[in-house]
Amino acid sequence: LMPKEYRTIEEAADYEDLYAHIVKKFQETFFDAEGNMTAQTQTAHIVALYFGLTPEVYREKTVKRLTELLEKENGHLVTGFVGTPYFCHALSQNGRVKEAYDLLLKEDFPSWLYQVKQGATTIWEHWDGLKPDGTMWSADMNSFNHYAYGAIGEWMYRVMGGIEADESTRSEERRVG
């Protein structure tokens, strides 16, 4: 979460202190004394895991609970714009690669492949933007090219494809091949 370069050493120290304070407050607010998250949603667990906000001693417990919440929904995500982009990352970064693939490959509603089965060539704003009978979810707020759910593409090229940016050099110095 922390930038790699700063203009001054003092600025770096300030940001490191701020980060430590944010993590501490997050943990005090969203974890109880037994290591359970106070918000029992998929998104809360995803955010805590993906952004490194989970106390290390409770990491496995948090991952286990996230998989339980996923199982409770028959392997479906019930997340929105905050949790969806990081769901498969949170799973795969914590040893649950199979669950991440299973989530990606679900074909029934709500899922990415549900949209594909409905004829989608882009990622929709709503999982059921177009229903099986051809009617629209709603004429309002029904984009058929939407970012949040489309963020699965990043997980696909980084994790499935193994393509990562080389942050150690400037872009014009990088070569593929």
Predicted regions and their residues:
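Active-site core of glycosidic bond-cleaving carbohydrate-active enzymes
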Residues: 1-175
